[in-house]
């Protein structure tokens, strides 16, 4: 009997289910799919690079043996992840790629040299993962996302230049590169150039040294869409500012689109020529703020779906509440959690992951009783009232704040927090936390009370140690 790839993999999985622990099977085997079987070679697609490494380094002998037994002959097993064979050195699929050392490429010329490949894969500097479809839009980024999409669809018309600013790790580079990808999908002949300010400066210095300024200017001014990242690093570089000013003018006057990213607005970049500030402000300045709780949860959920990882909602809520400053930190925490589960074989739960994310225990040494005591003190209710089922407004608000701070200051899971408050369901706890998050942004009095409790419990200082 000749087996198809799916049939063979199904038989192998049945055998592995009896040999492996349930956490190992559920984390690494169940999400793995068969991508092909031909000429004695079984190709498996792991859900993420960590799973791929685990399969290759620890589970491959068992998989090969079971596959060979099912086929009645030798079978070679190849494990892939993210459309590429995983090597043992692969650890982080979403790590930022190194800055390209070369000058920005002419995408049309690049495609002519490799006609069989997608434009996304050949344009120097563009990360294939930084596309609009992978960007989670929240209140913090809605305007920037809408402006980026408008620029990608109709460059050189509105919002020229588009200046995207925001703190580290909030998605500026993602949005900027998504513009380039989307533009190439609409118009494969478009000349799209993505460059960091550092690369622009280095190219300029190199061109001066080699007496190649004409080629430098021709290369940058030939772009239909120029994407310039980290423009704040132009501060104090007078000659670079001079050259960029003329490059900007040439493109703008020709109706070409310029998109700029910075960690601050133009007016706050020190030692930046006033005429450049004026040019940057003539279009649209779109600010990206830190994401709120709901957006952080959506980011983790989307990443989990993209990586085909089964994450408990409780763990998603924990990570989203624990890492609040930027998206890169948030995704880094998820990466560490997945790696930890991959290495140890432990299930992806708050209880197993939290100690790894805070190995000193200094960020989470507040007890539930301490939270209840301090909240009742600041909000002028009794601890007994907080733990009761009364719906009096003052008590309900104190109870919600208690749940919120218990999540902030301890490693208790949502069900455990619910148990602390008289057996409340975990969805009730989640709702309470989300309500407090929303109110903190619009209610200064509540924000002050919450901060007072935090100060008494030293929650923030513990996290910084």
Curated annotation (Swiss-Prot):
SMART domains hit by this protein: AAA, Bac_DnaA_C
Residues covered by region (Domain IV, binds dsDNA): 342-465
Region of interest (Domain III, AAA+ region), ranges: 125-341
UniProt keyword terms in alphabetical order: ATP-binding, Cytoplasm, DNA replication, DNA-binding, Lipid-binding, Nucleotide-binding
GO BP field: DNA replication initiation; regulation of DNA replication
Localization terms from the record: Cytoplasm
Record region (Domain I, interacts with DnaA modulators): 1-81
A single GO molecular function term of this UniProt record: ATP hydrolysis activity
GO CC terms, sorted: cytoplasm; plasma membrane
Binding site for ATP: 169, 171-173
Domain comment in the entry: Domain I is involved in oligomerization and binding regulators, domain II is flexibile and of varying length in different bacteria, domain III forms the AAA+ region, while domain IV binds dsDNA.
Record-stated family: Belongs to the DnaA family.
Role played: Plays an essential role in the initiation and regulation of chromosomal replication. ATP-DnaA binds to the origin of replication (oriC) to initiate formation of the DNA replication initiation complex once per cell cycle. Binds the DnaA box (a 9 base pair repeat at the origin) and separates the double-stranded (ds)DNA. Forms a right-handed helical filament on oriC DNA; dsDNA binds to the exterior of the filament while single-stranded (ss)DNA is stabiized in the filament's interior.
Protein name as annotated: Chromosomal replication initiator protein DnaA
Species this chain originates from: Parasynechococcus marenigrum (strain WH8102)
Name of the gene: dnaA
């Amino acid at each position: 009997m000749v087996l198809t790839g799916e049939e063979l993999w199904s038989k192998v999985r049945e055998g592995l289910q009896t040999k492996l622990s349930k956490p190992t099977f559920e984390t690494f085997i169940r999400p793995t799919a068969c991508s092909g079987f031909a000429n004695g070679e079984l190709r498996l697609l792991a859900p993420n690079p960590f799973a791929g490494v685990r399969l290759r380094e620890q589970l491959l002998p068992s998989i090969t043996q079971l596959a060979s037994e099912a086929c009645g002959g030798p079978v070679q097993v190849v494990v892939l992840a993210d459309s590429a064979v995983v090597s043992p050195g692969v650890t982080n699929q979403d790590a930022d790629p190194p800055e390209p050392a070369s000058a920005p490429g002419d995408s049309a010329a690049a495609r002519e040299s490799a006609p069989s490949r997608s434009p996304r894969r050949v344009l120097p500097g563009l990360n294939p993962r930084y596309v609009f479809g992978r960007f989670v839009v929240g209140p913090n980024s809605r305007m920037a996302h809408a402006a980026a999409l408008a620029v990608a669809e109709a460059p050189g018309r509105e919002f020229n230049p588009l200046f995207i600013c925001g703190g580290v790790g909030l998605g500026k580079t993602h949005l900027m590169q998504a513009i380039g990808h989307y533009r190439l999908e609409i118009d494969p002949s478009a000349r799209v150039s993505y460059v960091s300010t550092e690369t622009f400066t280095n190219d300029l210095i190199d061109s001066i040294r080699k007496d190649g300024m004409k080629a430098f200017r021709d290369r940058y001014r030939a772009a239909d869409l120029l994407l310039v990242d980290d423009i704040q690093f132009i501060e104090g570089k007078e000659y670079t500012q001079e050259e960029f000013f003329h490059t900007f003018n040439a493109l703008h006057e020709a109706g070409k689109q310029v998109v700029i990213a910075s960690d601050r607005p133009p007016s706050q970049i020190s030692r930046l020529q006033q005429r450049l500030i004026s040019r940057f402000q003539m279009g649209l300045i779109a600010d990206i703020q830190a994401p709120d709780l709901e957006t952080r949860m959506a980011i983790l959920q989307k990443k989990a779906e993209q990586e085909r990882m089964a994450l408990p909602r409780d763990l998603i809520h924990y990570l989203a509440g624990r890492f609040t400053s930027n998206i890169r930190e948030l995704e880094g925490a998820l990466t560490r959690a997945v790696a930890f589960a991959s290495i140890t074989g432990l299930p992806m739960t708050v209880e197993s992951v939290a100690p790894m994310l805070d190995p000193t225990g200094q960020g989470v040494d507040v007890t539930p009783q301490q939270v209840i005591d301090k909240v009742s003190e600041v909000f002028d209710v009794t601890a007994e009232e907080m733990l009761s089922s009364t719906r009096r407004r003052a008590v309900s608000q104190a109870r919600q704040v208690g749940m919120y701070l218990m999540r902030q200051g301890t490693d208790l899971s949502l069900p455990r927090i619910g148990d602390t408050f008289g057996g409340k369901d975990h969805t009730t706890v989640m709702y309470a936390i989300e309500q407090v998050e929303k109110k903190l942004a619009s209610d200064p009095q509540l924000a002050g009370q919450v901060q007072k409790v935090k100060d008494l419990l030293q929650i923030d200082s513990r996290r910084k140690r």
